[in-house]
Structures are given as structure tokens and as C-alpha cells.
Amino acid sequence: MKRRTFLRTAGASVVGATALAGCAGNDGTDTESAGTGGFSGTLQVATYSSFTGKDTAGNWLKSIFEAAHPGVTVEFTTPESGLNQYILRQQNGAEIDADLYIGLNTAELVRADQELDESLFETVDEDLTRADTVKSGLQIDPDGRAIPYDTGYISLVYNGNEVENPATFDALTSEEYQGDLIVQDAGNSDPGRAFLLWTIAEKGPDGYLDYWRDLLDNDVTILSDWEPAYNAYMNDEAPMVVSYSTDQVYYHGEGVDIQKHQVGFLNDQAYANPEAMALFADADAPDLARTFMDFMLSPVAQAEIAVRNVQFPAVEGVDPGAEFSQYAYEPSEPVTFSYDELSGNVEGWIEDWRREIAN
């Protein structure tokens, strides 16, 4: 059994959902942290859809960075197949039409390294002035290519009017919670994959499939991704869903039944899923991309990313504000797998899960 890694500091992960990403932060216009210089041209940034658009972290970063660099335009692209698009392009010898990738997790980085002969990304940690401010427990790449910018904790969200927090993994398989849980497909969904890895950390590579068979016997619902799963939960199709421990950051205030947005940790744990950014090795604007990455690690940007992405900052000493801190929950025992632990294992775990459980 692979050793599981416990994080001792807060972190962040991608929400990966349109609803949560629309949570707006402060309307600050401080451009100092974005740097200055003689840059001009276009920075092409590949990311996920909910990072861009009105009131999102991406739109705020673009506005502030362009104001600090009048000759620069930041353009976002949202590849339908995510990182897989760029893995396939490199395998086929096609041009990588982006400078920077935002939204990379550990499992995706491992997959890219396993499937490609040459690295898709460039080492940058020694080139960034703020790279050493990232919390040490969040680092996902031993080669310094992928730099975390936020982290989330995968947990349960449950309706306290209907059920109590199960508190343990074993409780989820009991008759008391039969038919009560909605999860996501681990092959298609970031939170679904994180929850699968959490069960592997708890039950071990030799026991996790038996645990999932017990979940199936207890009528767990498996849906394709976070959004349909959360929508089903909000439509009262089941009183529990795998989601994020920052749920109440978005869902609180007048008219909101906060009991429907209770955060549940299993065995006092949640799965930490840091989200990272990485410079493509064949980037057309590498220096501009590095400057943008440093800006994303600045305290002002980190606070905005936390609130707008509804995730925890990746950098030490950042305060997202009292409201965020009141409603964002951190587990006493975060758990995750490291790059080395996932390397050579994660794809097999997912394929076995697909074959034995999802089918």
C-alpha cells in the first residue's frame, strides 16, 4: 500500500463549476502587483470554462494585468478536452497554441509525463520571484513546472434537514444512508477523481474496489461531473453530494437555508486537490507568461482568486477576508497523494474503477 501524504497547511483546488466560479470578490484596481515593463503582444492562456467570464478570477486577472501592461492582451481559451488536447497535439507533432495552462492537478501532470516522451511544460520555479511563497505542503511537481495557485478540499455537502453527517467512510455503506449519496464519475470529473483517490487513501489499493461495491449495494448515484451531480442534489434527488468544503462561501446569506449546505468530513479528513499553472515548453511568450504567473502568486491576486474561485489561497499569509474565513471549512487532517505516489498507479486505479464500478 502506498503511503498517503497528509498536508499540514491550507490549500486550494479547482471548483470546476460555473455556479461557484461566479462568486465575485472585491472590485480592487491595484495594478502594482501585476508588475511593469516593456511587454507587448498576446498571452494565450488555456484554462477551464468557469475560470473565465464575468466576475471570475480569470476576468479580474486579465483586467488588472492588462492595465499594468498596456501593450498586452490576455486571451483565454477553454479546450473541450482540457489538458488532453495538448497531450494529443504534442503526440501528433502539432503546434501548442497556448503559452500557459491554468487548472492543472497532480493526476493530470502524472498522465502527461507518462504519455509524452518530452515534457509538455517548462521548469519555472527558479524563475519566479514568488514561487517560494507557496505553502510547502501544496507542491505537486518535483520538477518545479506546475506551480499551485489555489487549493480545494473535497468533502461531503449534505442537507442537515434530512440527514446527519455520516462522519466515517463505513457509515456511508450502512442502511441509514442507503440511496443518500451522489458522486461524480472518476474518469471524467476532478472532484470525482479526488473522491476516488480519497477512498484509495482510506481503504488501500487492495480494498477500494470492495468499498465501492459496498457503495453500489447501498444505491450510490454516479453522475458524469460536478454540475449535474450538484444540480441533482439541489433538486432534492439525494441529501448528500461529493463537493467542496467551501460550499457555504457561495451559499449563505438572506433567503438561503444554510442547513442544506452543511459540510461533512469523513474520519475528520478531506481530500486536498491543489490547482496549478504551468508554462508550455514551446510557448511563444515565455517571459510574459512567467510575469503573469508571478502576478497570480501576489497577495492581492491570491485573495481575489480565493474569493472568486471559492477556494483556499496557495500562498502563505494571504487573508481572503472575514466572510470567506467564516464560511470556508478546513479539515483537521487533509489527505492527498503526491506526484510520486500517483506515478505509475493513478491511471490503473481509474481504469479498474471504470471497469468494475462505473460499468
Give residue spans per PLM region.
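N-terminal secretory signal peptides and thylakoid transit peptides that target proteins
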Residues: 1-19
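Bacterial lipoprotein signal-peptidase II cleavage site
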Residues: 23-34, 38
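Early extracytoplasmic/lumenal segment of secretory-pathway proteins
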Residues: 38-110
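Extracellular/periplasmic bilobal clamshell ligand-binding domains
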Residues: 322-359
